[in-house]
Amino acid sequence: MSQLNDSDIILFEYNFHYQNIRSKNTLDIAFGIDRNFLFGCGVAIASILLNNREISCEFHVFTDYISDKDKLYFSDLAKQYNSRINIYVINCDKLKSLPSTKNWTYATYFRFIIADYFYNKHEKILYLDADIACKGSIKELLDYQFSTNEIAAVVAERDVEWWQNRASVLTTPQLASGYFNAGFLLINIDEWNLNNISSKAIEMLRDPDWISKITHLDQDVLNVLLNGKVKFISGKYNTRYSINYELKDKVDNPVNDDTVFIHYVGPTKPWHEWADYPVSRSFLIAKASSPWCKEDLLKPVNSNQYRYCAKHKFKQKHYMAGIFNYLKYYKEKCF
């Protein structure tokens, strides 16, 4: 039995449908975000639509906040691409008691709400983190067929050494054969609910023994619960890259012509004005082809962002801007 009942969780729903009749061959794509990712999510959707005009997609955005301006932009986006976008405003009270960190808030648990919400509504959902940009076709995901007992198609994170670390820390030896990043989940909704994954995950996240082991919150938990019931697919669907890698002298950029989704991991996102690098181009192209086209990229608003902004400005040889942001950083830290 799910701990996340629709009537308790969904407060409001806004539907922006400019494709009058939903195609039978439609890929449902879902995002779970807080207010800090609304801008990024909108452009992520635009990037998918821009690169997949021949595919019917319906988008589902689960958030705990949305303004009238945001609703207008999402409506305009659906109209611009003759698409369907649904916004669900959710009650997060049941999630706020779960573990969180500086980098991962309770919003990371929205994927549990998503997987439960679509039970008996859709057979398959593509869950994506909002800090992605699409630069290729997702038709293979639309056509994807799950095998027997398969709960999700996933993409491996990092390398064998990392998998072995997770297997040891999480006392789950089978993870040595593969550990996935939860920012991309092609979910078999029936199997997910048959195995009661969301409820089991929440129970684990309330268990002191498990809390002492996990470092990657729901990602660790999902790897344990879905162990042996996932299929690892091509890394082109979740090509992870931190824009902060650009601060290094030598950068190994995994993004190439085959990449479908760039996943901008780490604290610096392509919607930050200090993220001025070629790897941000896919995001910026989509932004220019969306209702957010005239919106400024975001400036730093806290000490951590001022620090990274300063570092990137020096890397980009914008020295005065670098000095200014370091001064702002020290002011935030000291006062």
Short names for language-model regions:
Residues 1-27, 33, 189-335:
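A glycosyltransferase accessory/donor-loop signature
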Residues 35-52:
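Histidine-anchored nucleotide/phosphate-binding helix
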Residues 132-166:
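Conserved donor-nucleotide/metal-binding helix-loop-beta segment in metal-dependent transferases, i.e.
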